[in-house]
Design a protein with these regions (language model features):
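Glycine-rich, positively charged N-terminal anion/phosphate-binding segment
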Residues: 2, 17-92
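Alpha/beta enzyme core
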Residues: 79-110, 118-195
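N-terminal small/glycine-rich loop or linker at the start of catalytic domains
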Residues: 1-13, 45-65, 100, 104-108, ...
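Aromatic- and acidic-residue-enriched carbohydrate-binding clefts of CAZyme catalytic domains
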Residues: 115
Length: 321
């Protein structure tokens, strides 16, 4: 698959997710089979105003292609922000967020709010394409709500504006993450565009991935919430798509070792305090579905040092299966 002049050998994408896909987690997912990662979304305006905290979110991971994702609704600010994002990160492509459904983003006209103003969205893509020398991609939804589904028209505008690829989450903004993703609509988007289309939504594992790929004809798949605490889903989906035997998830002890490695990377990136805050969230996800893990989840909720992490990890590996 090609994203503009960028060759993609493994079109299995890790979705950009605020508060989740930091450098540490992207690094782990890339090692375990994600072919393309995207940073957490960053504000174009914050980049222009030289906010250092925002800039730190753009660290490029190794082991996969990596895109920098920005959001905003002013074409000129977005163009400036795009240039800065690439200067800071050295990422392989620039992704524009037109899919975030969170109220503080969407109600400000950013993220999925741009699906209510398709002409402005088109101007933003045109401005960003002119401003940067890497492929520009767009992530969007089906529309604002059930009564205003405009995904077909919207994605055609993105292509006309110069987008090199679109990723479509098969839900409207008003659905947030509820209901069932509409793969049929993604199929229709794929049928009308000549640029690559990536399917996103309800790709929960290898079986769902095969069904989605077959039904939509999408050029690639993007996995989001299904990888929380389970980065091995990329390994499994990659094998399924290649027609190979699907590997089993590692035993708990080995999964915990990967979790600890992730938190060590987070410490390198953010320092101990932030790494422990991230660990409280991610560690609990790594224990989803593990019997008798409630006691340890309570301990995880109050982690404050890396030594706490090592101690709890050792106890879990000893006591649980």
């Amino acid at each position: 698959m090609q994203i503009g002049n960028l060759s993609v050998e493994n079109p299995l994408f890790l979705a950009p997710m605020a508060g989740v896909t930091d450098w540490a987690f992207r690094t782990v997912c890339a090692r375990l089979g994600a072919g393309v990662t995207v940073t957490e979304m960053v504000s174009s305006r914050a980049l222009v105003y030289k906010d250092q905290k925002t800039a730190k979110l753009l660290r490029k991971n190794e082991g996969s292609l990596c895109g920098a994702q920005i959001f905003g609704n002013d074409p000129e600010i977005m163009a400036q922000g795009a240039r800065l994002a690439l200067e800071i990160s050295g990422c392989d492509f620039l992704d524009i967020n037109m899919g975030c459904p969170m109220p503080k983003i969407a109600n400000s006209g950013d993220g999925s709010g741009l699906m209510r103003t398709p002409e402005l969205a088109q101007k933003i893509v045109e401005a960003v394409v002119k401003a940067v020398n890497v492929p520009v991609t767009v992530k969007c939804r089906l529309g604002w709500d059930k009564g205003s589904i405009n995904g077909l028209e919207f994605t055609k505008r993105m292509e006309d504006a110069g987008a090199a690829m679109v990723t479509v989450h098969g839900r409207t903004r008003s659905q947030l993450y509820s209901g069932v993703a509409d793969w049929d609509m993604i199929r229709k988007v794929k049928a009308q565009l000549s640029i690559p289309v990536i399917a996103n939504g309800d790709i929960t594992g290898p079986e769902a991935a095969l069904r989605c790929a077959k039904w939509t004809g999408a050029d690639g798949l993007m996995i989001g919430r299904s990888c929380f605490g389970d980065p091995w889903v990329f390994q499994q989906v990659k094998a399924a798509m290649a027609g190979e035997e699907i590997p089993q998830r590692p035993v708990l002890k080995d999964r915990i070792a990967v979790a600890v490695e992730q938190f060590q990377l987070a410490e390198q990136d953010h320092g101990e305090h932030v790494a422990c805050l991230e660990a409280r969230k991610h560690f609990a996800w790594y224990l989803r579905g593990v019997s008798h893990s409630g006691f340890y989840k309570q301990q995880i909720s109050s982690l404050t040092t890396m030594e706490d992490i090592y101690r709890v990890a050792k106890e879990i590996s000893r006591d649980l299966q």
